[in-house]
Amino acid sequence: MDTKAFKRSLNHSENYYRQGFGHKDEVAGMMTSEYQSSLIQEIRDNNYELTRGDVTIYLAEAFGFCWGVERAVAMAYETRKHFPTEKIWVTNEIIHNPSVNNRLKEMNVHFIEVVDGDKDFSGVANGDVVILPAFGATVQEMQLLNDRGCTIVDTTCPWVSKVWNSVEKHKKKNYTSIIHGKYKHEETVATSSFAGTYLVLLNLEEAEYVRNYILHGGDRQTFLDKFKNAYSEGFDPDKDLDRVGVANQTTMLKSETEQMGKLFEQTMLEKFGPTEINDHFMSFNTICDATQERQDAMFDLVEKDLDLMVVIGGFNSSNTTHLQEIAVERNIPSYHIDSGDRLLGNNVIAHKPLDGEITTQTHWLPAGKLKIGVTSGASTPDKVVEDVIAKIFAEKAQPAALV
């Protein structure tokens, strides 16, 4: 399928919207009321620090809603305003934040259900309005909705679209796209639908395995079994790794994506030599500014003498998980929560460890004075961060917190 031609055609459709509907000012007021926070602004104005009682909060200098997320949510709100009576769907969570998604449900926006691992579009009818979320949708989903005569509201983040353009360039020039990401993540699923031949790699360990295969060969079936579900149909590691271009899921760790790019560039240099490198490796620049800024701010934050760290964001949020990784790698006790509701009172917290299930921790706030770092993922509103910080202050002021 010529995905570029399809997108070009869709862009000219009278049923396709990407710029909003003229309700920007009204929606901005709603967004401010529902998602912004006077407490968080106070902390910003106080050099990102606030002390109350025995607790000093250190807030990361870049955190929370990124521009792409704010844009997507605002467009969803505008869509409801512009189509007050039409049935509105969103193909996935609009962003990875439960409070925002629940708010859309309150506005009578329907979410496409997943049945046996596949999205069920059977309830979507001609004339329905369908919102594509911030991390995009597959080209096949777009085609289905277009063929069904739906009104499509595309809130895909421009940084994600930039990655799609990169993999389409790879496809046009017969390069295999090496995509640094999680093959099940909605953004990577969408990105791979625009690619030709592709292989999704989670981390540098997997990249090193592929590098070794490129340079020294190996058992083809073992390779295919190792990366099952993470490559394009018909992918052959013996033929499809001679020409590669690197792209990424925008929420992955910047440093790891850069290392992966350098690793494959060096691999092709070793295999084909400096005179042939440009025919076998395509450079990239698809790292999202907002992701980078939040990670850089987190690296700065963990340099402080923190007693513990609280990372706030959806449990399925990739960018939030990577912020948590930074704290864990510095051996800072760190708690990933998705809302203030996870602070259960009596000095008990329900949190999600890296690569683990939600667990309950008692006496998580030690006695005495505490320095607590706080950050949040790109899909987390300031109001949610405020709720968490306020509950920490209240919890620490209670006798139970000192047990």
Curated annotation (Swiss-Prot):
Record's keyword terms, sorted: 4Fe-4S, Iron, Iron-sulfur, Isoprene biosynthesis, Metal-binding, Oxidoreductase
Cofactor(s) listed in the protein's UniProt record: [4Fe-4S] cluster
Binding-site residues, dimethylallyl diphosphate: 96, 185, 317-319, 379
Metabolic or biological pathway, per its Swiss-Prot or TrEMBL entry: Isoprenoid biosynthesis; dimethylallyl diphosphate biosynthesis; dimethylallyl diphosphate from (2E)-4-hydroxy-3-methylbutenyl diphosphate: step 1/1; Isoprenoid biosynthesis; isopentenyl diphosphate biosynthesis via DXP pathway; isopentenyl diphosphate from 1-deoxy-D-xylulose 5-phosphate: step 6/6
Catalytic residues in the record: 187
GO biological process: dimethylallyl diphosphate biosynthetic process; isopentenyl diphosphate biosynthetic process, methylerythritol 4-phosphate pathway; terpenoid biosynthetic process
Annotated positions binding (2E)-4-hydroxy-3-methylbut-2-enyl diphosphate: 96, 185, 250, 317-319, 379
Annotated EC: 1.17.7.4
Cofactor binding remark: Binds 1 [4Fe-4S] cluster per subunit.
Record has Transferase as a keyword: no
Reactions catalysed, as given in the entry: isopentenyl diphosphate + 2 oxidized [2Fe-2S]-[ferredoxin] + H2O = (2E)-4-hydroxy-3-methylbut-2-enyl diphosphate + 2 reduced [2Fe-2S]-[ferredoxin] + 2 H(+); dimethylallyl diphosphate + 2 oxidized [2Fe-2S]-[ferredoxin] + H2O = (2E)-4-hydroxy-3-methylbut-2-enyl diphosphate + 2 reduced [2Fe-2S]-[ferredoxin] + 2 H(+)
Protein residues bound to isopentenyl diphosphate: 96, 185, 317-319, 379
UniProt-listed Pfam families: LYTB (PF02401)
GO molecular function: 4 iron, 4 sulfur cluster binding; 4-hydroxy-3-methylbut-2-enyl diphosphate reductase activity; metal ion binding
Broad EC category: oxidoreductase
Binding site for [4Fe-4S] cluster: 66, 157, 288
Protein task: Catalyzes the conversion of 1-hydroxy-2-methyl-2-(E)-butenyl 4-diphosphate (HMBPP) into a mixture of isopentenyl diphosphate (IPP) and dimethylallyl diphosphate (DMAPP). Acts in the terminal step of the DOXP/MEP pathway for isoprenoid precursor biosynthesis.
Family under the similarity heading: Belongs to the IspH family.
Name used for this protein in its record: 4-hydroxy-3-methylbut-2-enyl diphosphate reductase
Originating species: Picosynechococcus sp. (strain ATCC 27264 / PCC 7002 / PR-6)
Lineage: Bacteria, Bacillati, Cyanobacteriota, Cyanophyceae, Oscillatoriophycideae
